[in-house]
């Protein structure tokens, strides 16, 4: 079966789902050349070969190009209308990557190893968020983008927004998304509390990786958008004070405390992974 796609975002979701055949309806913006360039940028060109058809169904103008090199396509132009068929490359297994990307595989902020959610913690966080049952995911305080990237690779269907206050993290996150073949993450740079979010926006899963001393305010804003039936918030606390603030904010906003997990990695301080749910969660 061919998985149909329209637009670059949909193409990448299909690729990250490891579909063997992907049909793409192109336009004057989402051209075969643009698709090929983007695939190369995110190292997705190794998994697929590309066919391009011009004027399909027109006996006088129809032309079909079977070209194995995505790089070659990235330098070519085609007449409109056209369409693309991506096919699994020979000897390509198309296997979903293992969960838990090693921390050493990420570009860090000023080489600060504590400014990343560690791989074992990251795996637990994503499990608690139940992203397989979610559609919209927010990563607040993304820093390196590790949580968003892991989510994108494991759950390609998600619409992901990553929020980060530090301007210097923008290039780091973008570089990490390219490095780990994780396109389609909507990155928003700025203070989460000051960023505009449409009133009727609903989010299913939220990870709070950083709060800048404004944890209660962040949870209050998140609570106003959280899916009341199956929404989840996960926060990694490294102090009793932040754990206390999280519990208080959950109660103040009519949410439910779902679970707590205490874990210690190596010689690091203990971490309490806290999970809250929407007010009508069952």
Each language-model region and where it sits:
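Conserved SAM-binding motif I beta-strand of class I
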Residues: 159-164
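Conserved class I S-adenosyl-L-methionine
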Residues: 134-143
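Conserved SAM-binding loop of SAM-dependent methyltransferases across substrates and taxa
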Residues: 144-156
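Conserved beta-strand signature within the Rossmann-like core of class I S-adenosyl-L-methionine
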Residues: 230-238
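Single conserved hydrophobic/aromatic residue that forms the stacking wall/gate
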Residues: 1-12
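Active-site capping/gating segments
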Residues: 61-81, 242-282
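A contiguous loop/helix-start segment that scaffolds small-molecule binding in enzyme catalytic cores
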Residues: 20-112
């Amino acid at each position: 079966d061919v998985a149909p796609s329209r637009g670059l975002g949909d193409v990448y979701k299909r690729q990250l789902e490891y579909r063997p055949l992907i049909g793409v309806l192109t336009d004057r913006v989402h051209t075969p050349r643009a698709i090929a360039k983007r695939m190369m940028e995110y190292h997705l060109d190794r998994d697929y070969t590309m066919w391009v058809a011009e004027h399909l169904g027109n006996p006088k103008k129809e032309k079909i190009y079977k070209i194995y090199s995505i790089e070659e396509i990235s330098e070519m132009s085609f007449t409109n209308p056209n369409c693309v068929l991506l096919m699994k490359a020979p000897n390509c297994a198309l296997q979903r990557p293992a969960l838990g990307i090693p921390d050493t595989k990420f570009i860090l902020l000023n080489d600060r190893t504590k400014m990343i959610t560690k791989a074992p913690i990251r795996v637990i966080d994503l499990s608690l968020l139940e992203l397989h049952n979610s559609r919209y995911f927010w990563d607040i305080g993304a820093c390196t983008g590790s949580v968003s990237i892991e989510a994108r690779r494991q759950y390609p269907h998600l619409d992901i927004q990553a929020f980060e206050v530090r301007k210097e993290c923008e290039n780091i996150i973008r570089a990490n998304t390219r490095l780990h073949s994780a396109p389609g993450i909507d990155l928003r740079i700025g203070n989460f509390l000051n960023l505009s979010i449409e009133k009727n926006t609903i989010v299913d899963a939220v990870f709070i990786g950083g709060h800048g001393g404004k944890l209660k305010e962040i949870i209050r804003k998140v609570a106003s958008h959280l899916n009341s039936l199956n929404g989840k918030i996960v926060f990694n606390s490294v102090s009793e004070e932040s754990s206390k603030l999280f519990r208080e904010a959950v109660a103040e906003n009519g949410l439910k405390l779902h679970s707590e997990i205490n874990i210690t990695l190596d010689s690091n301080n203990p971490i309490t992974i806290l999970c809250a749910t929407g007010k009508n969660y069952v």
